[in-house]
């Protein structure tokens, strides 16, 4: 036998490696298993004919084909109406009694993907809590009277005494440990700090569509058997089929919570009666759902909601009107990950997009056919100014009073822009300051987003080195709050110096300036 060439040896090595990989993945029998379960019989291949003559006597084969041992009712020609009755068992047992061919798992998956439609009571979706107890838990929030991180110590020495540094020397909440505060089941994608000041309420949503409500206990645990068994007061309910994108409260009624999702739906939750209403399902002209990436209530009209989508669309609608009409506008050809309204000029919005741009828009002016877009489906708005980033822009946020716009993205930077005066804005936006910051996440961590505090010119952002960093609008760092894991999704309390961050396992880190808490050990 002639010796193999180098090419042939390499080919044999590749074949062997691929076969080993298939064995490890257990894929060798998948195709035949699928055909078998579907009731499709693969015809046996006829052997290749030989040149020699064969004898005329042939073995007679059985005419009856071999039937699969497992077949669904559909393949047996039976109707679903033939079922005599439903067994008297609970839901979990009923799901486990599915057909023997594994269709019960598909049925369960279909149920999980079924969105909540219409108006519902949360108590109907939460079977392990009494309705009266739930109402009692949240009724205290039913009132409308709320009208470079890693080297912080060295930075602090260089900056000297900066106003606000002591103010944001916050303490980690320690009544319960962070690993005990599992507010959702999956990776947190949105958090919200309710504006109530007498009692803390933190709301979070995860990537599966579950929403968690945490009534924060401020009183220390006593050395008693009852308190040793105490757990964080958390209520969870599944309202969506995909990521919870944004959580907010209605400006005119803070007992009413607004929730949006990547599945295109917007829902409200009334804390006084735990009624959840369907506000809107955002769809295009083809009746396809448009995932909602971000939203914010208008400063000029608190009943009007501005929102952006995963496909680059933008619209506004009146939340008081059910089935409200809306007109879609195109602001990007790719996902808009973040949107913010300018508090000094409420007709201006900023967007950060996967197309690697930060853009400022004037929503008063319409552009019928935007030259920058490859689509011709919707009109757009007038572009005031643009900043081109090296990589995608993850977040945009305006300071409340001094005209600073912050953005961060996958290029590991935080950029600050002076947008106080419209007259000084050029078509090409230039940052007044760039801060190096470790904020590039991977697949298993939610995107880090800088957020200005609603009542102060300070912003916070999570750090991939497991911390929350706080800066003022001049770029001076005020605090570095260390955590055990990455608190990727942060939310400020709008009036108090409290901040919360959610991680990839559904847990919350809470920092406050309460005197009763004990500082985290260095």
Swiss-Prot record:
What ranges does the record list as Polar residues composition bias?
54-63
| Induction of synthesis | Closely coexpressed with replication factor A (RF-A), the cohesion complex and the DNA polymerases alpha, delta and epsilon.
- Superkingdom assignment: Eukaryota
Q: Does the keyword section mention DNA-binding?
A: yes
Name the GO terms of the biological process aspect. DNA damage response; regulation of DNA damage checkpoint
What is the name attached to this protein's record? DNA damage-binding protein CMR1
Keyword hit for Ubl conjugation: no
Its predominant location is: cytoplasm
> GO molecular-function annotation terms?
DNA binding
> Could you state one GO cellular component term attached to this entry?
nuclear periphery
- Localization annotation: Cytoplasm; Nucleus
State the remark under miscellaneous: Present with 3810 molecules/cell in log phase SD medium.
What's the family?
A: Belongs to the WD repeat DDB2/WDR76 family.
Keywords attached to this entry:
Cytoplasm, DNA damage, DNA-binding, Nucleus, Phosphoprotein, Repeat, WD repeat
Report the residues modified as Phosphoserine. Answer: 64, 224
Which organism encodes this protein? Saccharomyces cerevisiae (strain ATCC 204508 / S288c)
Q: Which residues carry this modification: Phosphothreonine?
A: 69
What is the purpose of this protein?
DNA-binding protein that binds to both single- and double-stranded DNA. Binds preferentially to UV-damaged DNA in vitro. May be involved in DNA-metabolic processes.
Q: Where is the composition biased (Basic and acidic residues)?
A: 75-84
Disordered: annotated span: 38-100
Q: Which PANTHER family match?
A: WD REPEAT-CONTAINING PROTEIN 76
Identify the stretches annotated as WD repeats: 183-224, 239-281, 287-327, 331-371, 388-427, 442-481, 482-521
Pfam families reported for this sequence: WD40
């Amino acid at each position: 036998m002639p010796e193999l060439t180098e090419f042939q040896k390499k080919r044999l090595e590749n074949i062997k490696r691929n076969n080993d990989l298939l064995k490890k993945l257990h894929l060798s029998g998948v195709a035949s298993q699928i055909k078998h379960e579907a009731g499709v019989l693969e015809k046996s291949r006829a052997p290749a004919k030989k040149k020699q003559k064969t004898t005329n006597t042939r073995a007679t084969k059985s005419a009856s084909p071999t039937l699969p041992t497992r077949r669904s009712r559909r393949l047996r020609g039976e109707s679903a109406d033939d079922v005599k009755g439903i067994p008297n068992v609970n839901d979990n047992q009923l799901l486990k009694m599915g057909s023997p061919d594994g269709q019960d798992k598909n049925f369960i998956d279909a149920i999980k993907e079924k969105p909540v439609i219409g108006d519902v009571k949360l108590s109907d979706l939460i079977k392990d809590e009494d309705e009266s107890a739930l109402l009692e838990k949240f009724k205290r929030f039913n009132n409308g009277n709320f009208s470079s991180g890693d080297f912080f110590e060295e930075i602090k020495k260089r900056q000297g005494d900066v106003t606000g540094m002591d103010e944001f020397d916050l303490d980690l909440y320690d009544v319960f440990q962070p690993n005990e505060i599992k507010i959702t089941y999956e990776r947190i994608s949105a958090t919200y700090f309710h504006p109530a000041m007498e009692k803390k309420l933190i709301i979070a949503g995860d990537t599966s569509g579950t929403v968690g409500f945490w009534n924060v206990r401020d009183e220390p645990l006593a050395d008693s058997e009852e308190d040793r068994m105490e757990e964080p007061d958390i209520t969870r309910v599944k309202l969506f089929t995909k990521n919870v994108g944004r959580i907010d409260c209605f400006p005119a009624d803070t007992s009413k919570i607004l929730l949006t999702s990547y599945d295109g739906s917007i829902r409200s939750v009334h804390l006084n009666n735990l009624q959840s209403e369907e506000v809107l399902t955002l769809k295009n002209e083809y009746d396809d759902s448009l995932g909602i990436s971000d939203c914010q209530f208008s400063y000029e009209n608190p009943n009007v909601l501005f929102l952006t989508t995963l496909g680059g669309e933008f619209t506004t609608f009146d939340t008081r009107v059910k089935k409200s009409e809306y007109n879609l506008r195109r602001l990007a050809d790719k996902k808009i990950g973040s949107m913010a309204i300018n508090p000094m000029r409420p007709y201006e919005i900023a967007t950060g997009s996967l197309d690697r741009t930060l853009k400022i828009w004037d929503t008063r002016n319409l552009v019928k056919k935007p030259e920058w877009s490859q689509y011709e489906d919707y009109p757009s708005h007038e572009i005031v100014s643009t900043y081109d980033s090296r990589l995608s822009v993850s977040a945009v946020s305006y300071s409340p009073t001094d005209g600073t716009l912050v953005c961060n993205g996958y290029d590991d930077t935080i950029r600050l822009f002076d947008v106080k005066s419209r007259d000084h804005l050029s078509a090409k936006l230039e940052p007044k300051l760039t801060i190096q910051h470790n904020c590039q996440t991977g697949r298993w961590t939610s995107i880090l987003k800088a957020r200005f505090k609603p009542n102060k010119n300070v912003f916070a952002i999570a750090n991939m080195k497991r911390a929350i960093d706080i800066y003022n609008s001049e770029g001076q760092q005020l605090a570095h709050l260390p955590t055990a894991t990455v608190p990727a999704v942060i939310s400020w309390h709008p009036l108090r110096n409290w901040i919360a961050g959610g991680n990839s396992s559904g847990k919350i880190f809470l920092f406050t300036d309460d005197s009763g808490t004990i500082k985290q050990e260095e």
